[in-house]
Amino acid sequence: MASPQRLTVKLCNISPRVLQNTRKRQLLSPTTPIRNTYKENKDRLSPFNIDTPNRRKILEDGLPKKYGTVLGSGGFGTVYKAFYKGNQVAAKVMQTEKCVDVLNSEKHASSLRHSNIVKILMIEQGSSLSLITMELCGTTLQDHLNTTPLPKNKVVRILRGVTCALQFCHNAGVVHADVKPKNILMSTDGQPKLTDFGSSVLIGEPLRTSKFHGTPGYVAPEVLKGNKPTPAADVYSLGIVAWQMISRKVPFAGLHSHAIIYLSAKGNRPENDDMNDGFEGVYKTLYRKMWSQDTIDRPATDQVINTIDTLIAQ
């Protein structure tokens, strides 16, 4: 049999940069103390304040490395805790030249207002650097799964919240295209919030780039074969997340990304036969339908919500 890497080339053209491991991302609690050096050192503009004119200085010169509370970092930039109009926010600083497509995709979410979607407050694109200012939330769902098992009632409520967020996006004509635990933040009151729309696409518009959409292990098979992400692709990804919330395992852990892509495209799914879902198999049946190989076999978001509501009522 041909190697997974050779077979993968036929499925899609993948940028190695997109497949980088992003496990280094660490998000801090919004209650973490932070020192406002802008008030303490008036001679130097502080990265903690991104109001004008400080924001313009940051876009021109960047942030001094010795300043700033880093919330996370990845291939497309670094996220800092900052102040904007007197409030604590999360500010993602990116190199404009490398992130034009990401910025355009993030703009898809700039007008989305939903309790389960991280609010984008401002997007400013400079010649050298660009800045995305967002609502500040807590840690990621992935962080929660890494440390503590989730009670079954919390699992279904998280799944419902993210499904409602996706339903709102789809009704607004936006496909997220990268649903995974690292892109779901947990607020201080326990509400899940969908974030990072850097891979998102608009429904009904042709793809303008050939970039890889999503993360291996979570990407729907039709997308791996070169098709544009659709609402059904988001449902597939959420099905993987639903499995992960009770297994607390990473899909296809330990395999090379090329092998994961090959297996997913061919119809393989994470092992789940021996797991007790806590709902007499109803929850397991739901996520298996969500990750169906054929898009027409996947439930729509309203069907997912209806099933979850029956589980919550138990």
Annotate each language-model stretch with its function.
Residues 119-128:
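Short beta-strand micro-motifs within the conserved protein kinase catalytic domain, predominantly
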Residues 234:
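Conserved catalytic-loop aspartate of Hanks-type protein kinases
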